[in-house]
Amino acid sequence: MPTLAETFLRRPHGVLEYVADAVRVVAALSVVVVGVGWGVVEIAVLMLALLGTLVPRMLGLRATFDLMVGVAALGAAWSSVFELYTRITGYDTVVHFVLNGLLAAVFVVLAHRAGWVVSPDHGDGRGGAGRSARVGSVLVTVAFGLAAGTLWEMGEWAGHTLVDSAIFVGYDDTIGDLAAGGLGSLLAGLALPFLVGGDVRGRGARASSPGAGVDGADGRGVDGPGGDAVGHGRPRIHHR
């Protein structure tokens, strides 16, 4: 199994991985841009977004998931810079629904790598044990999402109180954001097998395990030609 550093420094394969890396470059440049044209709050927001784009690559998440997290994190950060949350009614709720759910799924992957929870890529969920594992993964994702949403709201309150009173906070806003984040996390939990299936580290483990075979006679994988989620064409285990 490759280390986090090895996974992060590997060469991209497939169009989606190159696009996800381009998003990371844009995020890094965005930190420089806000450092010149905006203030400390905006710099902190874009640095958090940059971190959000880097973690999926360190974890070797499948390209689709990686790209979704990067675009959502960067979009949410720039939306804050341009104050879109207060200018567009309901926009804040949509961002919480999408980003909170994706981040909850990332946290579940981190927890699995640390050995705290079972694998979120738990197959088809058939049988009592499989169904229990699937339900458990969904519940853990929702729990992570609600916890992340709470920390998010606490951060907004701290920013409003200690840094800039222009940061919008309010009871209705907080409850609505937490509810949206919880629903997004529920959806992400249900989609975990798709989101984490075919990630780089998982493919490496499957490729090196006994009995691995080519996934499909034509070498196509879940994300198109080339075999796996990002077009590597590497061996994978057939589920029987």
Report each predicted region and the residues it spans.
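Primarily interfacial, aromatic-capped hydrophobic alpha-helices that serve as membrane anchors
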Residues: 176-240
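Interfacial helix-loop-helix junctions of multi-pass membrane proteins
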Residues: 85-92, 150-186, 190
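Membrane-interfacial alpha-helical segments at the cytosolic side of multi-pass membrane proteins
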Residues: 98-118, 161-167, 182-196
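Cytoplasmic-side transmembrane-helix entry/capping segments in multi-pass membrane proteins
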Residues: 62-75, 92-98
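Membrane-interface helix caps and helix-loop-helix hairpins in membrane proteins
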Residues: 33-39, 82-91
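Alpha-helical transmembrane segments of multi-pass membrane proteins
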Residues: 53-57, 72-79, 104-108, 144-152, ...
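Alpha-helical transmembrane segments and their cytosolic membrane-interface
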Residues: 1-43
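Internal alpha-helical transmembrane segments of multi-pass membrane proteins
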Residues: 115-146
